[in-house]
Amino acid sequence: MNTDEHRYKRGVLSVFICVHLWLIFLSGCSRYAEFTLPPASGGDPDLTFAFDALPEPVLSRGQGWDSGDVLNPSVIRHDDQLLNYYSGFDGHTWHTGRATSSDGIHWQRQGKLLSPDPSTWEGSYIAANGAVLEWQGRVWYWYVGGPKTHPQIGLNGRVVLPTGPYLSWDEIGVSDPYVIRIAPYFYLYYTGLDRGRRQRLGVARSADGVHWEKLRTNPILAPGDPGSFDENGLGEPAVWQSHGFYWMLDTGRDIAENRRLGLARSLDGVHWTKLPAIFQGTQSWDSKAICDPTVLVDGDTIRVWFGGGDVASPDENLHGQIGYGTLRPVNATLQK
């Protein structure tokens, strides 16, 4: 081998090593893939929803661990009852509790289930804001843990969805998991936070609920223009399938930190279109915030539990309580 060939091959090898290491650095601890959800059948393009909520909360603040806020409901049907895994704030720390109900309106508290472990990745601030799902006879609960400045998503005491790599859209935090299952995958919708403190939405998928690959083209939904209901950020997605589409409720924050729910629609679960419908609190107890939706399609009824508060705040101390309503399909053209 002559000197020029040797230099050339060493140069190619050096470039390969540098590029390989850079790709590893960019990938962080997460895997990435291109995917969509199974295509929806499509439905009436003029279909939208109206929201009919009960005037009073269905789960109010308690004593001790959930005396500050009661928010972030996640509801499933289990046997002959409903289970609600919700977040309680005691003024310093977020915990997860559980309540049960036969009708989704009258709830019985079962106590606190989960608190952060300061000796682990969870830190001392949060072990809540989760997503519950029943699969193969077991109840799975993905939750947010970690310090307030760097949240991650965990399952059974370990991080399963970490933050993204340097300068990525979810570098600073991932939170607000919402998990659905469409065989053979789980799909996890979540909020990502970048170093500019912008909140956007993304999706990941997993074959086992533990090992996730993020969508390479995340984020899938971003805040709106100045003056919009979600100009200051959006998060807390809730996704379901009905009427020929995938639908999403998400929480938008305006410049004054009032929170309202927005509605979006998709044919593949990845490419979303925001719809004009915006749902806001109509009572004194949820006058400043309506947030944290969870959706249960129960026969022909689309049931929604949500958090509400009378204080405008981006995170806690809302005087938070949990409300209930239903989504009623309507024709957008006839509403005009």
Question: What is the predicted role of each segment?
Answer:
Residues 291:
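Predominantly extracellular/luminal carbohydrate-interaction, adhesion, and secreted-enzyme modules
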Residues 294:
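Conserved active-site neighborhood of enzyme catalytic/cofactor-binding cores
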Residues 1-33, 333-336:
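Intrinsic disorder/low-complexity segments
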Residues 29-235, 240-288, 297-336:
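Beta-rich carbohydrate-recognition and catalytic domains
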